[in-house]
Amino acid sequence: MTETEGRLGTHFLEVVAQELNRIKVRAEKAIAQLADDRRLHVKLDAESNSIAIVMMHLSGNMLSRWTDFLTADGEKPSRNRNAEFEAPETMTRAELMTAWERGWACLFGALDALTPADLTATVRIRGEQFSAMEAIVRQFDHYASHIGQIVFLAKHLEWERWQSLSVPRRRQ
């Protein structure tokens, strides 16, 4: 690996960590605006996911994908993906946040341990091979789409008192 490649790899890892943290915080700010824990479990229809379900799915995905990231298949036998979509309506905000933080801690721990040279390593997800860099980008895309769902649903539920998470559109 050349010096330039090493710097580029370091920069990539730093930017990914920074942007993942940014979307994590965005979701947490949206969740914080929910008036009560019951709203975490609201579904728009029978096929939709609640914020609680998305949180549990993200946590389960992160624990599976980022545990032994370079050495084991990203779909761990211990993961019960279907159960992630059946988050009990009795789960409190505190319980959900504990699971949420556990997933993110696993992700950031694995990401922090990577070196630029690791980015070209081959990793597997459900038996399919990817470069580590490609797997990271795919996971970022997955997480960003689900964070968007969390923000959308929180804004929908709290529309009357919603505080914009970015630059608010003009009000007439």
Locate the predicted segments by residue:
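Short, flexible helix-adjacent loops and helix caps
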Residues: 32-39, 116-119, 123-124
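Acidic/histidine-rich alpha-helical segments that form the ligand environment
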Residues: 85-123, 133-143
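Hydrophobic alpha-helical core bundles mediating ligand binding, dimerization, or RNAP-core interactions
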Residues: 16, 20, 24, 31, ...
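Terminal targeting/low-complexity segments that flank the catalytic cores of oxidoreductases
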Residues: 1-9
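Active-site rim elements
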Residues: 9-17, 90-97
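Short, contiguous alpha-helical
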Residues: 2-3, 17-28, 37-84, 125-172
